[in-house]
A protein has these predicted regions:
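Short hydrophobic/aromatic beta-strand micro-patches
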Residues: 2, 138-140
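Structural detector for hydrophobic anchor residues on beta-strands
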Residues: 118-120, 135, 144
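A short acidic/basic microdomain associated with nuclease active sites
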Residues: 117-127
Length: 208
Protein backbone atom coordinates (compact mmCIF):
# COMPACT_ATOMS: atom_id res chain seq x y z
CA UNK A 1 0.00 0.00 0.00
CA UNK A 2 1.33 3.43 -0.96
CA UNK A 3 0.89 6.75 0.87
CA UNK A 4 -1.88 9.12 -0.30
CA UNK A 5 -1.27 11.35 -3.33
CA UNK A 6 1.29 8.99 -4.86
CA UNK A 7 1.00 6.95 -8.03
CA UNK A 8 -0.11 3.35 -7.93
CA UNK A 9 2.78 0.92 -7.70
CA UNK A 10 4.17 -0.40 -10.98
CA UNK A 11 6.29 -3.53 -11.00
CA UNK A 12 6.60 -6.82 -12.83
CA UNK A 13 3.55 -9.01 -12.17
CA UNK A 14 2.04 -6.27 -10.01
CA UNK A 15 -1.00 -4.22 -10.99
CA UNK A 16 -1.47 -1.05 -8.98
CA UNK A 17 -4.88 0.44 -8.20
CA UNK A 18 -6.01 3.77 -6.82
CA UNK A 19 -8.93 3.63 -4.40
CA UNK A 20 -10.75 5.69 -1.81
CA UNK A 21 -10.31 4.18 1.65
CA UNK A 22 -12.52 4.83 4.65
CA UNK A 23 -11.30 4.99 8.26
CA UNK A 24 -10.82 1.42 9.41
CA UNK A 25 -10.12 0.12 5.90
CA UNK A 26 -6.37 0.02 6.59
CA UNK A 27 -4.68 -2.24 9.15
CA UNK A 28 -1.06 -2.97 9.98
CA UNK A 29 0.28 -6.51 10.04
CA UNK A 30 3.92 -7.20 10.83
CA UNK A 31 4.81 -3.63 9.96
CA UNK A 32 3.04 -3.72 6.58
CA UNK A 33 -0.03 -1.61 5.78
CA UNK A 34 -2.87 -3.68 4.29
CA UNK A 35 -6.52 -3.26 3.53
CA UNK A 36 -8.68 -4.85 6.23
CA UNK A 37 -10.24 -8.27 5.74
CA UNK A 38 -13.65 -6.64 5.27
CA UNK A 39 -12.44 -4.07 2.73
CA UNK A 40 -10.50 -6.75 0.83
CA UNK A 41 -13.62 -8.92 0.62
CA UNK A 42 -15.58 -5.97 -0.79
CA UNK A 43 -12.83 -5.28 -3.35
CA UNK A 44 -12.88 -8.94 -4.43
CA UNK A 45 -16.56 -8.62 -5.36
CA UNK A 46 -15.51 -6.82 -8.55
CA UNK A 47 -13.42 -9.76 -9.79
CA UNK A 48 -14.84 -12.96 -8.25
CA UNK A 49 -18.04 -14.73 -9.20
CA UNK A 50 -20.72 -15.20 -6.56
CA UNK A 51 -19.62 -18.68 -5.47
CA UNK A 52 -15.99 -17.71 -4.95
CA UNK A 53 -17.00 -14.50 -3.18
CA UNK A 54 -19.09 -16.57 -0.77
CA UNK A 55 -16.17 -18.99 -0.32
CA UNK A 56 -13.88 -16.07 0.56
CA UNK A 57 -16.45 -14.74 3.02
CA UNK A 58 -16.94 -18.17 4.58
CA UNK A 59 -13.18 -18.37 5.16
CA UNK A 60 -13.28 -15.06 7.03
CA UNK A 61 -16.18 -16.23 9.21
CA UNK A 62 -14.97 -19.82 9.89
CA UNK A 63 -16.14 -20.37 13.46
CA UNK A 64 -13.00 -22.12 14.72
CA UNK A 65 -10.76 -19.15 13.85
CA UNK A 66 -12.86 -16.16 12.68
CA UNK A 67 -11.09 -13.24 11.03
CA UNK A 68 -14.25 -11.17 10.76
CA UNK A 69 -17.98 -11.30 11.49
CA UNK A 70 -21.15 -11.00 9.44
CA UNK A 71 -21.95 -7.68 11.12
CA UNK A 72 -18.54 -6.24 10.18
CA UNK A 73 -18.90 -7.40 6.58
CA UNK A 74 -22.38 -5.88 6.40
CA UNK A 75 -21.00 -2.60 7.73
CA UNK A 76 -18.15 -2.67 5.20
CA UNK A 77 -20.61 -3.19 2.34
CA UNK A 78 -22.73 -0.28 3.56
CA UNK A 79 -19.67 2.00 3.65
CA UNK A 80 -18.06 0.79 0.41
CA UNK A 81 -17.42 3.86 -1.76
CA UNK A 82 -17.66 2.20 -5.18
CA UNK A 83 -20.56 0.66 -7.08
CA UNK A 84 -18.30 -2.04 -8.57
CA UNK A 85 -19.36 -5.42 -7.27
CA UNK A 86 -21.99 -3.97 -4.93
CA UNK A 87 -24.83 -6.13 -6.30
CA UNK A 88 -22.69 -9.25 -5.90
CA UNK A 89 -21.78 -8.30 -2.32
CA UNK A 90 -25.43 -7.93 -1.39
CA UNK A 91 -26.27 -11.28 -3.00
CA UNK A 92 -23.39 -12.96 -1.17
CA UNK A 93 -24.07 -11.67 2.34
CA UNK A 94 -27.14 -13.85 3.11
CA UNK A 95 -25.35 -16.90 1.68
CA UNK A 96 -22.35 -16.69 4.03
CA UNK A 97 -21.78 -19.38 6.63
CA UNK A 98 -19.38 -19.68 9.55
CA UNK A 99 -19.41 -23.47 9.19
CA UNK A 100 -18.10 -24.14 5.67
CA UNK A 101 -14.63 -25.60 6.02
CA UNK A 102 -13.32 -25.26 2.45
CA UNK A 103 -13.83 -23.54 -0.90
CA UNK A 104 -15.26 -26.68 -2.59
CA UNK A 105 -17.80 -27.08 0.21
CA UNK A 106 -18.80 -23.42 -0.13
CA UNK A 107 -19.15 -23.62 -3.91
CA UNK A 108 -21.36 -26.72 -3.78
CA UNK A 109 -23.38 -25.24 -0.91
CA UNK A 110 -24.07 -22.08 -2.96
CA UNK A 111 -25.17 -24.24 -5.90
CA UNK A 112 -27.56 -26.16 -3.62
CA UNK A 113 -28.91 -23.06 -1.85
CA UNK A 114 -29.54 -21.18 -5.10
CA UNK A 115 -31.26 -24.18 -6.72
CA UNK A 116 -34.72 -25.46 -5.84
CA UNK A 117 -33.27 -28.04 -3.46
CA UNK A 118 -33.50 -27.66 0.33
CA UNK A 119 -30.70 -25.81 2.10
CA UNK A 120 -28.08 -28.20 3.53
CA UNK A 121 -26.47 -27.88 6.96
CA UNK A 122 -22.68 -27.47 6.62
CA UNK A 123 -20.41 -29.68 8.74
CA UNK A 124 -23.28 -31.43 10.48
CA UNK A 125 -22.23 -33.40 13.55
CA UNK A 126 -23.15 -37.10 13.67
CA UNK A 127 -22.03 -40.05 15.75
CA UNK A 128 -20.94 -43.10 13.77
CA UNK A 129 -20.13 -46.18 15.82
CA UNK A 130 -20.06 -43.91 18.84
CA UNK A 131 -17.43 -41.58 17.35
CA UNK A 132 -18.16 -37.91 16.64
CA UNK A 133 -17.92 -37.15 12.92
CA UNK A 134 -18.94 -34.32 10.63
CA UNK A 135 -20.70 -34.56 7.26
CA UNK A 136 -19.62 -31.73 4.96
CA UNK A 137 -23.16 -30.90 3.79
CA UNK A 138 -26.11 -32.69 5.32
CA UNK A 139 -29.87 -33.05 5.10
CA UNK A 140 -30.51 -34.73 8.46
CA UNK A 141 -34.29 -34.92 7.92
CA UNK A 142 -33.70 -37.17 4.91
CA UNK A 143 -30.35 -38.61 6.03
CA UNK A 144 -28.68 -37.48 2.81
CA UNK A 145 -25.11 -36.19 3.00
CA UNK A 146 -22.50 -34.76 0.64
CA UNK A 147 -18.76 -35.19 1.17
CA UNK A 148 -15.87 -33.51 -0.65
CA UNK A 149 -12.98 -35.78 -1.59
CA UNK A 150 -9.89 -33.65 -2.18
CA UNK A 151 -6.77 -35.07 -3.79
CA UNK A 152 -5.15 -35.60 -0.39
CA UNK A 153 -7.97 -38.04 0.36
CA UNK A 154 -6.48 -40.19 -2.43
CA UNK A 155 -2.75 -39.68 -1.88
CA UNK A 156 -2.76 -40.06 1.92
CA UNK A 157 -3.21 -43.77 2.60
CA UNK A 158 -4.50 -43.31 6.15
CA UNK A 159 -6.95 -40.63 4.99
CA UNK A 160 -8.17 -42.84 2.14
CA UNK A 161 -8.73 -45.82 4.40
CA UNK A 162 -10.44 -43.66 7.00
CA UNK A 163 -12.73 -42.16 4.35
CA UNK A 164 -13.86 -45.61 3.22
CA UNK A 165 -14.47 -46.71 6.80
CA UNK A 166 -16.44 -43.56 7.65
CA UNK A 167 -18.44 -43.82 4.43
CA UNK A 168 -19.41 -47.39 5.24
CA UNK A 169 -20.26 -46.40 8.81
CA UNK A 170 -22.54 -43.62 7.51
CA UNK A 171 -24.35 -46.07 5.23
CA UNK A 172 -24.73 -48.50 8.15
CA UNK A 173 -26.40 -45.67 10.10
CA UNK A 174 -28.88 -45.11 7.26
CA UNK A 175 -27.22 -42.21 5.44
CA UNK A 176 -27.27 -41.93 1.65
CA UNK A 177 -24.04 -40.23 0.57
CA UNK A 178 -23.03 -38.15 -2.46
CA UNK A 179 -19.28 -37.77 -2.98
CA UNK A 180 -17.75 -35.02 -5.10
CA UNK A 181 -14.23 -34.02 -6.19
CA UNK A 182 -12.58 -30.94 -7.63
CA UNK A 183 -13.65 -32.00 -11.13
CA UNK A 184 -17.29 -31.83 -10.07
CA UNK A 185 -16.94 -28.12 -9.31
CA UNK A 186 -16.90 -27.63 -13.09
CA UNK A 187 -20.03 -29.74 -13.55
CA UNK A 188 -22.28 -28.73 -10.67
CA UNK A 189 -25.54 -29.72 -12.44
CA UNK A 190 -24.47 -33.36 -12.05
CA UNK A 191 -23.96 -32.87 -8.31
CA UNK A 192 -27.40 -31.26 -8.07
CA UNK A 193 -29.04 -34.09 -10.00
CA UNK A 194 -27.41 -36.75 -7.82
CA UNK A 195 -28.45 -34.91 -4.68
CA UNK A 196 -32.01 -34.48 -5.92
CA UNK A 197 -32.29 -38.20 -6.69
CA UNK A 198 -31.07 -39.07 -3.19
CA UNK A 199 -33.50 -36.61 -1.58
CA UNK A 200 -36.49 -37.80 -3.60
CA UNK A 201 -35.58 -41.37 -2.74
CA UNK A 202 -35.81 -40.38 0.92
CA UNK A 203 -39.21 -38.71 0.68
CA UNK A 204 -38.53 -35.14 -0.43
CA UNK A 205 -41.38 -34.14 -2.73
CA UNK A 206 -39.90 -31.01 -4.27
CA UNK A 207 -40.04 -27.28 -3.56
CA UNK A 208 -43.16 -25.73 -2.19
Amino acid sequence: MSPPHTRATKARNVVGHCATLNPGDVVERYGVLLTSAERTWCDLAAILDLSDLVAAGDALLWHEDPVSSLARLQDAVARYPSQRGRVRMRLALPLLSAHSRSRPESIVRVALVTSELPDPIPNFEVFLRGVRREIDLAYPRYKVGLEYQGDHHRTDRAQWRGDIRRGNDAVDEGWSMVYFTGDDLHNLPDVLRRTERRLRGRGWTGPG
